[in-house]
Amino acid sequence: MNTNDLMAKLQAKYPYEKEYLQAVHEVLESIEDVYNQHPEFEDAKIVERIVEPERILTFKVTWVDDNGEIQTNTGYRVQFNSAIGPYKGGLRFHPSVNLSILKFLGFEQTFKNALTTLPMGGGKGGSDFNPRGKSDAEIMRFCQAFMLELWKVIGPDQDVPAGDIGVGGREIGFMYGMYKKLAQQYNTGVLTGKGMTWGGSILRPEATGFGAVYFVQHMRQMAGKDIAGKTVALSGFGNVAWGAATKATQLGAKVIAISGPDGAIYDPEGMNDEKIAYMLELRASNNDVVAPFADKFPSATFYPGKKAWSIKCDIAMPCAFQNELTDADAVEILANGTWLAAEVSNMGCTPEAIAAFQKAGIMFAPGKAVNAGGVATSGLEMTQNAMHISWSPAEVDEKLHAIMSNIHEACVKYGTQPDGYINYVKGANIAGFMKVAQAMLEQGVI
């Protein structure tokens, strides 16, 4: 395999899908040497097959707003790879959603799910619907209209969606209600991220953030150190950042910065239970602003238009969108003396930012490893649904911690360089790829 040749073909075929091409290029660069040591992969054209989704569903979503006006959005489901299990991946409702973003997310999800060692393939979906400023009734009507098409292609052994940006427990509930009506069966295994009263798993809302902090903790332990007493900056203030802030605080770190589209919050006193709970209130307001945090807590200061990375910290954890942390941000982070950066959002750093971190020799880990706790706990929710049982918080947390430990070990196994530096990007990509590639090889050309 020659990465440049394959990328040239994909760029000619999908010239406008920059996010998808970026994700594919990162993986191919990481695996090229290992791949070329396996002629059986080349003979079966594994790479050429693995970079293309198995199926893409695109559909119209028509709904009525509170003013009685008819609105139309586009819905998608990208069923990327089912070599190791049913398609599994979230639904994103955001105006930026397009096919390139969902293909990149589905591609990343394939390897992320493989890293968990749970039997889950990769998929992703969503819509360009913007929940911001919408009433509960409007969101319900949209979710119901969205499910009118999606229900035809999902199921516990076929495709199991979950939440993502713009899709939380409320939206999952609305969609499941419509699914149940259409399918005429009570099958909670068709979606994850459900409410606790009807088949959801303890800790699922917090799981992505919890798992990310566990992964960071393992990274620090590799250096014989801990995260207790260290300062943390997070971007975002939704479920992911909330979970990360909660677990980091529990482990003794001090979360001093969060951010939103309107700017950044700096709180030198760090987070406590009241402040962490208020993050969820801000997200639930649908206003997508973080400034009110500084109005409520006198110790906090709001910086309009700034990012969390402008604040000096030990650990930087982007928790919002793809490519949110740029090369300019990386320069600022390095100048501030940050010694660990971990993507909690999917592909949260640009390639230039990652290169800057690796050149500087600081610890850096990619989203497909760091944020795998979310889908891992979704997998645990699927298991509980299939077995008709419910595990305690301690049981789920123990299993989550063990999964994140195993992912870290896999990254170290494949990512340790001759000079001792751990290239977590390379390690995660190779570990995930090898599992999926071997499964595809054994299942024949399909």
Describe these PLM feature segments:
Residues 2-23, 219-220, 334-446:
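Adenosine-phosphate binding glycine-rich loop
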Residues 68, 164-165, 201-208, 233-237, ...:
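Active-site nucleophile and cofactor-binding loops and adjacent substrate-binding regions
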